Curated annotation (Swiss-Prot):
Gene Ontology cellular component terms for the protein in this record: cytosol; exodeoxyribonuclease VII complex
HAMAP family linked to this entry: Exonuc_7_S
Keywords on record: Cytoplasm, Exonuclease, Hydrolase, Nuclease
Annotated EC: 3.1.11.6
Annotated GO MF terms: exodeoxyribonuclease VII activity
Gene Ontology biological-process annotations: DNA catabolic process
Protein name, UniProt field: Exodeoxyribonuclease 7 small subunit
Family in the record: Belongs to the XseB family.
Catalysed reactions, as listed in the record: Exonucleolytic cleavage in either 5'- to 3'- or 3'- to 5'-direction to yield nucleoside 5'-phosphates
Primary localization: cytoplasm
Subunit structure of this chain's protein: Heterooligomer composed of large and small subunits.
Functional description taken from the UniProt entry: Bidirectionally degrades single-stranded DNA into large acid-insoluble oligonucleotides, which are then degraded further into small acid-soluble oligonucleotides.
Compartments where found: Cytoplasm
Length: 78
């Protein structure tokens, strides 16, 4: 499965595995660089997925079932 096809959870699981391997400290330099590059790609993917979800969360369905911006403002008259 290509990295871009991973779910957020799958990407995080792979990223956690890479971090664990690198923290062990007995990884050859070349392999550590490969892990680092893969980890950075996974980190970017997770960040993009979170940003996408955040964008969706700031919208709310109106009565016609259309998405509209969701604006949380406290009522100052209460």
């Amino acid at each position: 499965m290509a990295t871009k096809d991973l779910t957020f959870e799958q990407a995080m699981e792979k990223l956690e595995g890479i971090v664990s391997k690198l923290e062990e400290g007995d990884v050859p330099l070349e392999k550590a660089i490969e892990y680092y590059q893969e980890g950075m790609n996974l980190s970017k993917l997770c960040s993009e997925k979170l940003n996408h979800v955040q964008d969706k969360m700031v919208q709310i369905m109106n009565e016609q079932g259309e998405l509209e911006p969701f604006d949380i403002q406290e009522d100052s008259s209460s």
